[in-house]
Amino acid sequence: MKEVKAVHKYAKTSAFKARLVADQIRLKSVEEALNILSFSNKKAAVLVKKVLNSVISNAEHNDGLDIDELFVTSIYIDEGSTMKRIRPRAKGRANRILKRTSHITVGIGK
């Protein structure tokens, strides 16, 4: 059984938020996963859907696999780098803003 993978690095969403979406499509058929992502209201769903479409294209074009037989065999979200920003506050103080990123990896197979 061959697994085809695609990765989106430095996606502009936190890993915690993206994992909520990833848990919904793990071990589902590719068609069902696309339906779930299409009707989800989360920003991370759009990012995961782009990676899923990319890995489907890779499997079809590079390996000649049939899309109807494919399942999401692995999907995981790792934390990327965090950009640190400053928000000025009263009396010369500052609060830190953490702009988190994540790495989205989707693998499909039979």
Curated annotation (Swiss-Prot):
UniProt keywords, alphabetically: Ribonucleoprotein, Ribosomal protein, RNA-binding, rRNA-binding
The keyword Ribonucleoprotein is annotated on this UniProt entry: yes
SUPFAM superfamilies for the chain: Ribosomal protein L22 (SSF54843)
Protein name as catalogued: Large ribosomal subunit protein uL22
HAMAP family, sorted: Ribosomal_uL22_B (MF_01331_B)
GO MF annotation list: rRNA binding; structural constituent of ribosome
Organism: Vesicomyosocius okutanii subsp. Calyptogena okutanii (strain HA)
Family to which the UniProt record says this protein belongs: Belongs to the universal ribosomal protein uL22 family.
Matches recorded under InterPro entries: Ribosomal_uL22, Ribosomal_uL22_bac/chlpt-type, Ribosomal_uL22_bac/org-type, Ribosomal_uL22_CS, Ribosomal_uL22_sf
GO cellular component, one term: cytosolic large ribosomal subunit
Function of the molecule: This protein binds specifically to 23S rRNA; its binding is stimulated by other ribosomal proteins, e.g. L4, L17, and L20. It is important during the early stages of 50S assembly. It makes multiple contacts with different domains of the 23S rRNA in the assembled 50S subunit and ribosome. The globular domain of the protein is located near the polypeptide exit tunnel on the outside of the subunit, while an extended beta-hairpin is found that lines the wall of the exit tunnel in the center of the 70S ribosome.
Quaternary structure, from the entry: Part of the 50S ribosomal subunit.
Entries under Gene3D superfamilies matching the protein: Ribosomal protein L22/L17
NCBIfam families referenced in this protein's UniProt entry, alphabetically: rplV_bact (TIGR01044)
BP GO annotations: translation
